[in-house]
């Protein structure tokens, strides 16, 4: 996927739902990992290009610690999101522990059962699905075509589209339906 576009999408979702003075907790993952850093960059680029002056509390931790809880509990926090699937689990736990579940706009990353449950239970408002299965499938397909047929990929980078999941379309991502979206 184009990770910067994913960051922009997350930012657009959030800033279309919160006031201009509301702060955002951004579970940013590991800044040394290119995917995480590019999502954060896209988020920041969207803010700059659209004149958003909202304060961002950046959290690079891998578990819900006291710093993350302090950020979530700040009275100015109107939204939160995570750039990685593990961070989404952490974020949901933090929102529940702090009593903020359903009170701030929250966006998670990737579709898996825990995130779908959080969406259905109104802890998460949206999930950005980065399609990891499709990423793996297309990567292996390109490799097999190269090794077996000698056919090099047409482009150096293969982009996989991302999708925004709402409660209204979550049924498409239920266990029985989800695999069918890959084909």
Functional labels for PLM-detected ranges:
Residues 6-10, 34-53, 68, 90-94, ...:
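Short, solvent-exposed amphipathic alpha-helices that sit
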Residues 1-25, 65-69, 111-115, 131-148:
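Hydrophobic alpha-helical segments within soluble ligand-binding/sensing domains
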Residues 47, 131-183:
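Hinge/cleft segment of the Venus flytrap/periplasmic-binding protein
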Residues 43, 56-118:
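Hydrophobic alpha-helical
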Residues 25-34, 58-59:
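Short beta-strand->loop
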Residues 125-126:
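Conserved phosphoryl-transfer motifs of two-component systems
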């Amino acid at each position: 996927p184009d990770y910067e576009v994913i960051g922009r999408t997350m930012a657009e979702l959030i800033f279309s739902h919160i006031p201009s003075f509301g702060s955002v907790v951004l579970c940013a993952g590991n800044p040394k990992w290119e995917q995480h850093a590019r999502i954060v960059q896209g988020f920041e680029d969207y803010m700059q290009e659209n004149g958003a002056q909202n304060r961002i509390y950046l959290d690079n931790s891998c578990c819900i610690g006291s710093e993350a809880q302090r950020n979530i509990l700040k009275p100015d926090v109107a939204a939160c999101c995570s750039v990685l699937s593990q961070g989404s689990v952490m974020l949901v736990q933090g929102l529940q522990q702090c009593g903020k579940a359903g009170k701030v706009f929250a966006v998670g990353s990737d579709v898996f059962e825990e995130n779908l449950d959080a969406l259905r239970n109104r802890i998460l408002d949206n999930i950005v699905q980065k399609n990891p299965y499709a990423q793996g499938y297309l990567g292996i397909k390109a490799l097999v075509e190269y090794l077996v047929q000698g056919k090099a990929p047409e482009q150096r980078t293969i982009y996989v589209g991302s999708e925004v999941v709402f409660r209204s379309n979550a049924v498409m991502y239920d266990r029985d339906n989800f695999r069918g979206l890959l084909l």
